[in-house]
Amino acid sequence: MIKVTLTNEILRYITEIEQNRYKVSSVKLSKTVMNKLRKNSKKKSSYASNKIEGNPLSEKQVDEVIESDGRKHYLKPEQEVRNYFLALNYLEEKVSKKEKLSMKLILDVQKLVEKGASKEKIGLRGPMPPGVLFAVYDSKTGNPDYIPPEYCDIPGLLNELVEYVNTTDDHPLIVAAVVHYQLVTIHPFEDGNGRTARLLSGYIMDLNGYGFNG
């Protein structure tokens, strides 16, 4: 069972965010301007989220790749940013339908993030070969930084997260933070955990009126 304890500092930050949210939501923009700003925001998110994972493309290159719809083949770094942008569009549609978080939605988002990857990287991770440890390794030392839960515990942990999100009375910003933390902690996939966590954390915010114009 997921429980959250709020400190005075966290409550102070939430109050500050709410005040800024009110200021932003009161700004009136035309639909054309709004759509342009929204698209630019999604491009910047696609750049930043993949940059965290080591994607070498510059912000300008990301913009060009997203706009280049005519090509048939993309290099891996290009495919990654296109996948992220498509996942943002997908979740935007889900927000319009007020779709709640579900196991299916989590899996669908990771599948979009890993589009073009080998089938082993798509979906929940399975058992490792004998003697092989599944862990998050330090990129410099090669030592394990974090050992996530066993693969057999993943479905139960994800279902617990889904139930929490859909039944809790916690503030939406707290729920979004919990979604991000739990997904990177559970580490349910072989690859794409961080990007999926950031996408779904943002989705929870969008769903509760903390999106681009909220």
Residues covered by each model-derived region:
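FIC/Doc superfamily catalytic core
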Residues: 1-214
